[in-house]
A protein has these predicted regions:
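Non-transmembrane, aqueous-exposed alpha-helical and coiled segments at domain scale
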Residues: 13, 17-277
Length: 277
């Protein structure tokens, strides 16, 4: 996302929570020449034109553009808790922090709460000398504290919600089969789809936050019955358990964006989730 996008996101940086007449007029002008292919409900059209404020209108507009790009025809409700991939307070993410500030000023948050990927450094378990801590805290991740304030204002579940594996019981963000999710973390998306039977596309960072705030996501690809059908059958015939990274890379390079069905791993890892898996 270009840095200048942070200045007003799509232009004007004024926030409207309730939507005065002038707010709605400005939003209507902003979206006057905005054409899209998705079929929106009357309520969704009203949101796009400012019924829930200018910032929510921008969220809706972004998701409509996202849906159009992938051929989605409609929105579907999100019924699982959110999970964010962006967890580092690193300076190159300043545009992200500015967008989050705008969401907060607009009074928006994730009502159901969300989890987020791990913090950059685990000082309790990874020992660092004073110089290393200084570099990490002041230079590399100098915006971590202020970013976590933003996360809390937007609906972070708790201080224990930093993990890539949000689906574990102790974290409390375990989707059910058939749940529609708005996630971006690649490993969690794969686990949710393949193990838990939930439905989630590999969204990009911030897009997944927008979907959780709106409570809806564009319906395409892995959210549809057709999009979940495997186009490849991959049979693993190696004499010993393959390295996960090598196997995943080999399959990915072959199938690209298609859905594979992988056979032959159960003789090593079984069919149940255990520590050995």
């Amino acid at each position: 996302m270009p840095t200048q996008a942070a200045e007003g996101w799509f232009g004007n940086n004024k926030s409207a929570v309730l939507g005065t007449y002038e707010d709605k007029r400005r939003i209507n002008l902003m979206n006057e020449n905005f054409s899209y292919k998705m079929k929106l409900t009357d309520e969704e059209k009203e949101i796009l034109h400012g019924s829930k404020g200018e910032v929510m209108a921008k969220v809706m507009k972004t998701l409509v553009l996202y849906g159009d790009a992938f051929g989605a025809e409609r929105f579907v409700p999100v019924n699982g808790k959110g999970h964010l991939v962006t967890s580092f307070g690193i300076s190159v993410l300043k545009p992200v922090f500015s967008i989050m500030d705008e969401l907060i000023k607009g009074g928006l948050k994730v009502d159901e709460g969300f989890t987020v990927d791990p913090r950059p450094i685990d000082y309790a378990n990874v020992k660092c000398n004073p110089l290393q801590k200084l570099i990490f805290n002041k230079i590399l991740y100098g915006m971590q504290d202020s970013y976590e304030v933003q996360l809390n204002k937007l609906g972070l579940k708790s201080d224990k919600s930093f993990t890539c594996a949000c689906y574990f019981d102790e974290v409390g963000n375990t989707p059910k089969k058939g749940d529609i999710l708005s996630w971006a973390e690649s490993s969690a998306v794969v686990f949710a789809n393949s193990v838990l039977g939930a439905r989630c596309n590999r969204n990009s960072g911030i897009i997944e936050l927008f979907g959780s705030i709106l409570g809806k996501v564009p319906e395409f690809d892995l959210l549809t019955d057709e999009g979940r059908k495997a186009k490849w059958i991959i049979e693993v015939k190696t004499t010993k358990i393959p390295e996960a990274q090598v196997l995943g890379s080999a399959i990915g390079m072959k199938v690209m964006e298609d859905v594979p069905y992988v056979k032959g791993l159960d003789k090593w890892i079984g069919t149940e989730l255990t520590d050995d898996a």
